[in-house]
Amino acid sequence: MVHVDNEHGVPHYWGKTGKGLQRLITIVATTDFLLFGYDQGVMSGIISAPAFTDDFPQVLDETYEGFVVSIYAVGCFLGALFILNFGDRLGRRKSIFLGAIVMIIGVIIQIAAVPPSGGATAQFIIGRCITGIGNGINTSTIPTYQAECSESHNRGKLICIEGGNVAIGTLIAYWIDYGCTYGPAPFVWRFPIAFQVVFASIVLVMMMKLPESPRWLLTHGRRQEAMTILAGLNGQPRDSADVTTQMATIEKAIAAAGHKGGKTPFSALFTGGKTQHFRRLILGASSQMMQQLSGCNAVIYYFPILFQKSIGTDHNLALLLGGVNMIIYSIFATTSWFAVERIGRRKLFLIGTVGQCLSMVLSFGALIPGTASASKGAAVGLFTYIAFFGATWLPLPWLYPAEINPLKTRAKANATSTVSNWLWNFFIVMITPVMIHGTGTNGWGTYAFFAAMNAIFFPIIYFFYPETSGRSLEEIDLIFAKGYTEKMSYVTAAKQLPRMEDHEVHEKAREYGFGSDDDIKVSHSESERENGVMTDSAV
């Protein structure tokens, strides 16, 4: 990484320090999640395009169609597994750099396919899988990197902004797909696929001169480098009081968590007791599972096909309506930026679940008569579904695992949650075409299935998911200690535990039997909370 000190001895990266440097890191994070969203949406307009099916006729088979789309999720799953095993060893910066390179290689392989040769389809599938590996690497790393380089008070908002950019990326993909339908046949699918390189290249170039996570450096004993980066993130000289204090805070947190060489054993994920590592792992990973089983990617990946097969529109109109739907998706995704702290995570989960369930009920109910006029109601249901999803379930499963898991297991638990996301993503994307074509219900059986899934999720969220809004990460640890020690529901424990200042958290931790070097970190000062960098979000 390249930095230059100014005349005051403050390190600069890309000519920026302090807030400016944090903005550059945010730009990288949002660009990568734009790419994430673009990848999710790009195949939706291509997979049923005549120009694509002429070049790759195998996708006319529903099972093969599902495989071509879902193989991307397999790649993402493999990328997340890679980070689960090697992320702490490689570091945040190198992981992101590697992910961007892998994605570019995958794109090149896809657009270099030359139909109608026998191996063209296989080459396209391999390239799509490799692109997914790169995306899996980055989506498992970027949220952690941004959190570790950001201020604690805007942790939730920043991760929700990342989620909002998934919707915006999908919007861009839909409209590029639609515009390319008016070009020559090879352009219809080659250009939308190739456009992914733009986002990946921005990430790649910017990461060349952006810093590593100071928290990761400290877990690996690279103290001087970490101090330089903290100084740059603060916009202060290395020997300033704030930088020195933050260094001490991070080092104490790492020691308290039992990090040795930056490694946490997998066995730590499965412990209970006052820390409830396993329960918290399940809460985070199951939120990703429920996001996928709610039907989101059945709608995002296959919106044009849903319209063509279930409602009877032609391909161009289906693409146009898909683009309009993605505008709605993007608009409502931005509402989470402002609602996540005011309304809370738990209430947003519940509101989204009810809205998504009713939207799917509307869609399958409107398709039962099998008439063109009634099927228009199904379109309304898909529009309302994506609005509720964008405002609630899109960002929350990325935020909740980052908050709910404790310092000691957070990196591995977050990677496990991402693995869960891509595993269930593959399952849903694979079975959706078969469900649409093979249920013999004019498509309404597909929507009935997702309505039932959302109905099941409501009591799970209501009874098992505690609220984390407005809590420091230390207070969230105390919620689980209170629930375990006092034998009560963790949802109730979250409601009963009062808001605390740092010294109160310390006293309560002692009451529950946590020592200064146990699993909980309780030694932040008020000035550290105000300064923000590398306090709550440092772990």
Where are each of the predicted segments found?
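Alpha-helical transmembrane bundle of multi-pass membrane proteins
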Residues: M1-N234, A248, I254-V539
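Short intracellular "coupling" helices and adjacent cytoplasmic loop segments at the cytosolic face
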Residues: G232-T244
